[in-house]
């Protein structure tokens, strides 16, 4: 049986894979596993969602499952995923649930569960919740033992007060275009940036339940790039559907990705003494240019597997203060337990305001190396990388690249392919080396 939980919760097409029945079962299982046993007070869960059309249906189902186990729900409505994580801690709730499929298309939806303190669940806890889903419900409470539902009317204001602390200086000189992806950031992001003093021009901030991520947001930045240039803005910020990501655009319309944002923030935090152990946490997908920029600043880069959960694990293990992904998931543990796109935007603009420098200038140390990616169909994606001929080809490329590039072989998580990625000083070199290794992989399949 396929595992329910993926790298970021449970996802699928709403009302097909992710049905109301499954949502209710997940709510029930989460309540049984995470509701604090023996608590003298009533147990509480925080539930939020993004604006997509299926959110109301799945929210009702999740809450029914939670209430059926005798756990109360604080319903916070449409808010960013990091807001639900923060409020789980702020309200001292037993757990939190966010109903969102992040940057995925509108027909999809997902369920993310946060444990006490707003932390993402570990694999063992997810496995136990999955077991409880398959077991089905046990004996349920009746009468006064059934969970109640309360709308948390102060949820947005509490979250905005919290993220406002990320703006370490006033942003009055700056004009920013904000692409809200018709998602959970549509109210929160413009309000947060205006409260810090920025002149805000929101775009794609009119969610109707159907238009989330539709040609907009952090995965479709063309309209933001055009808007920044046409308005003469200092920068643009793009969020995804649940606002845990932030990518940027400089005044010339050039995209500043998560790697470049991490470089800007790492250098700023090193200067202010906030960068714990002069260490940044990034995934294997970060460009070699990030490593070179950090090396020149004597900043160590700790590398993890793909996924912000692995970044979070390394941050917690080493008590580090900054980590993230090229995709724009940037984690600042002093401000939250997960990536927060609005906090990222505030910190980025604060650096611009403090220094008086443009975003293009601040991001200049990050020089992205040309990257070539080849997908190779294989019979067994788990073993082909260990074939002697493949290992020899990889070793030869690594020797030729030295410290001027890198090669990465990675089995796809969703397809029967191995991804061969090479970064080098020029694209021709990267392509030649990638083809050489891809040919060796293909020959073994």
Curated annotation (Swiss-Prot):
InterPro entries: A-D-PHexomutase_a/b/a-I, A-D-PHexomutase_a/b/a-I/II/III, A-D-PHexomutase_a/b/a-II, A-D-PHexomutase_a/b/a-III, A-D-PHexomutase_C, A-D-PHexomutase_C_sf, A-D-PHexomutase_CS, Alpha-D-phosphohexomutase_SF
Keyword flag Metal-binding: yes
Enzyme Commission code(s) on record: 5.4.2.10
SUPFAM superfamilies: Phosphoglucomutase, C-terminal domain, Phosphoglucomutase, first 3 domains
Keywords noted in UniProt: Isomerase, Magnesium, Metal-binding, Phosphoprotein
Keyword Metal-binding found: yes
Swiss-Prot/TrEMBL cofactor(s): Mg(2+)
Biological processes per GO annotation: carbohydrate metabolic process; peptidoglycan biosynthetic process; UDP-N-acetylglucosamine biosynthetic process
Enzyme class: isomerase
Catalytic activity entry: alpha-D-glucosamine 1-phosphate = D-glucosamine 6-phosphate
Molecular function per GO: magnesium ion binding; phosphoglucosamine mutase activity; phosphomannomutase activity
Active site: 102
Cofactor binding description: Binds 1 Mg(2+) ion per subunit.
Entry's Gene Ontology cellular component terms: cytosol
Residues holding Mg(2+): 102, 240, 242, 244
UniProt modification remark: Activated by phosphorylation.
Family label: Belongs to the phosphohexose mutase family.
Known function: Catalyzes the conversion of glucosamine-6-phosphate to glucosamine-1-phosphate.
NCBIfam families: glmM
Protein name, as recorded: Phosphoglucosamine mutase
Organism: Mycolicibacterium gilvum (strain PYR-GCK) (Mycobacterium gilvum (strain PYR-GCK))
Gene: glmM
């Amino acid at each position: 049986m396929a595992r329910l939980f993926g790298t970021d919760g449970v996802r699928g097409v709403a009302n097909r894979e992710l049905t109301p029945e499954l949502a209710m079962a997940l709510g029930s299982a989460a309540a049984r596993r995470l509701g604090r046993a023996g608590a003298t007070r009533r147990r509480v869960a925080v539930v939020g969602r993004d604006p997509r059309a299926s959110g109301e249906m799945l929210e009702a189902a999740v809450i029914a499952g939670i209430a059926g186990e005798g756990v109360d729900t604080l319903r916070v409505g449409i808010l960013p995923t990091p807001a639900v994580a923060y409020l789980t801690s702020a309200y001292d709730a037993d757990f939190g649930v966010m109903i969102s499929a992040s940057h995925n298309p509108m027909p999809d939806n997902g369920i993310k569960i946060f444990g006490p303190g707003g932390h993402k669940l570990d694999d063992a806890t997810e496995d136990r919740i999955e077991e409880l889903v398959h077991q089905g419900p046990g004996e349920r409470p009746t009468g006064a033992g059934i969970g109640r539902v309360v709308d948390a009317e102060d949820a947005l204001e509490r979250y905005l007060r919290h993220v406002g602390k990320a703006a370490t200086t006033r942003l009055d000189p700056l004009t920013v275009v904000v692409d809200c992806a018709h998602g959970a950031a549509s109210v929160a992001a413009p309000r947060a940036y205006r409260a810090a003093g920025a002149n805000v021009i929101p775009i794609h901030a009119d969610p109707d339940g159907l238009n989330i991520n539709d040609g907009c947001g952090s995965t479709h930045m063309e309209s933001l790039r055009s808007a920044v240039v046409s308005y003469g803005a200092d920068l643009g910020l793009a969020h995804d559907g649940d606002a845990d990501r932030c990518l940027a655009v400089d005044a010339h319309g050039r995209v500043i990705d998560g790697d470049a944002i991490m470089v800007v923030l790492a250098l700023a935090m090193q200067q202010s003494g906030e960068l714990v152990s002069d260490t940044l946490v990034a995934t294997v997908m970060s460009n070699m240019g990030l490593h070179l920029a950090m090396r020149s600043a004597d900043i160590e880069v700790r590398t993890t597997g793909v996924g912000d959960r692995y970044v979070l694990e390394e941050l917690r293990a080493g008590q580090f203060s900054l980590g993230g992904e090229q995709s724009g998931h940037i984690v600042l543990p002093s401000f939250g337990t997960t990536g927060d796109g609005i906090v990222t935007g505030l910190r980025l603009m604060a650096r611009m305001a403090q220094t008086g420098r443009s975003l293009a200038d601040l991001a200049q140390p990050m020089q992205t190396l040309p990257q070539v990616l080849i997908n190779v169909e294989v019979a067994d994606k788990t073993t082909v990388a260990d074939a002697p001929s493949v290992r020899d080809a990889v070793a030869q490329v690594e020797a030729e690249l030295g410290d001027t590039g890198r090669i990465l072989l990675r089995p796809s998580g969703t397809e029967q392919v191995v991804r061969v990625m090479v970064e080098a000083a020029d694209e021709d070199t990267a392509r030649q080396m990638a083809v050489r290794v891809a040919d060796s992989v293909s020959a073994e399949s």
